[in-house]
């Protein structure tokens, strides 16, 4: 009897414990439910690991807030896609100097490909895939282009491996290695996400995406030389005129401001607006912090340009806009470029495209190995075949406050006082200041097969002439004459423009006012092409502070409390607005083809955009932001997968973690 009672008590005690435990679990769950959970902003991070025995591995950390403490490994990456929020994605990649350069490069490519694979696919589908399948002629051109770039890739790979002790060629080798890693990472990312993509991206199309800046030049060569010599060429006699392709180009504005009271204090104002197909508007702000060396030997010095930030596109390892800021030990500089106009197609006879080096690879190599702006221009002058542009590069470290003696001399000259008597020490100090300013600003201009470069610092310090508007018209006289382009004062800044350009806000207004929107040309002429972004940069030498922000999407003006005007009202003005007068009269666009340019700008014929239509388009920039839903399928041309419908975004200033 006692045994039965004891057993029953034991069961009761166990049951009580179970009930208490269950109650505690309920209470704990209640409190956990009300605890503050970590909120993430959509930033995904990963680390690349490498050993000789195992090879490469990627550790994905999913969403993270504590970016600083992401494990370094060979390299690490953080990526946030905010295209629907502000028009930009953002990516930051860092590698470690203790690993061989080729390991750093391949790991960086793998990391980027694995996290951005979806945007890479969308960009390829919107641009290359849709453009190359448009008709028979573009299919043939794309086939020729893929064969050329693949052959060129194998040639470059062999040559860079042989010339590993050449600083420039070593960087080209690393670019190729990073691109190979990008393809591997793309495949791994898509496989890891178990994505069922409609098409595979061949490696030749990764090459093609990274040759985006060269394609317009290659198209000119193809139409005028490759196609003309082809046995399949059946064009009627008398119609084989040279084919050139002009589009509303990117615009770049550079101004160095000197304070009236302290002319020795310099400030840089810089604006850049890219021209391109609306289909290519999947944008990424990138930062590459790669600790490469001058050669493949780990004991060689680290390159000056370790830290490079730029605005770019998915799947492309450089800007192609082009705008870069470069930092490193004793280095802080910017680089900007726009396409250059060329009427002299005879220059292409001296160029062999099989020996080309893609522009984006050349620029990234120059950015990394150049300690100053002269060496940057010299590096860019190697292999100037395709990707013809005009460039400006500014050394921000040279924009420092002048010494006190120089200030006194400037003040005496200003007030017509008696000059200060100089001794040898004073003269030396002044000469050192002039030497300091030397090589602060360089301009380089490339036509097929040649490049002209020069230190133009003094030209930017002359009162009343401190700005340069780069819109494709050559800066140097010899380049202008060789290009056959007609110079026009209407394409340059006026005195009134110079006086108004005193801040980033005024640079912003100028570039928007003189922007081009092909979707506003009218119902019969609309094309999905124009100025698709705006980047603004300033540097205050006194404070040593820079400011950068970017806008995504076709440019438009934000008017407040303004009654919209009708076209009838505009017609009563009896004149062309100032904005239209700044239009380049030589620009021409093939409407039938330009609507499908995508990233590749595959144009096959010419037809001018009438001046009156351009004037209307430029006026209507104030009508509001671009919307895909307001364009017909014919006008759209390429695709727009992954794009927001309305491109109405405010400025974005990236914040970097490392």
From Swiss-Prot:
Hey, what's the signal peptide range on this chain? 1-29
Gene Ontology biological-process annotations: dorsal appendage formation; imaginal disc development; phospholipid catabolic process
Mind telling me which GO cellular component terms the entry cites?
extracellular region
| Keywords (A to Z) from UniProt | Glycoprotein, Hydrolase, Lipid degradation, Lipid metabolism, Secreted, Signal
Q: Where found, per UniProt?
A: Secreted
Tissue-level expression reads:
Expressed in neural and glial progenitors prior to, but not after, differentiation. Not expressed in late third instar disks, but is expressed uniformly by early third instar disks, in the imaginal ring of the proventriculus and in the salivary gland.
The enzyme class is hydrolase
Question: What is the name listed in the Swiss-Prot or TrEMBL entry for this protein?
Answer: Putative phospholipase B-like lamina ancestor
According to its UniProt entry, this protein's organism is: Drosophila melanogaster (Fruit fly)
Q: What is the lineage of its organism?
A: Eukaryota, Metazoa, Ecdysozoa, Arthropoda, Hexapoda
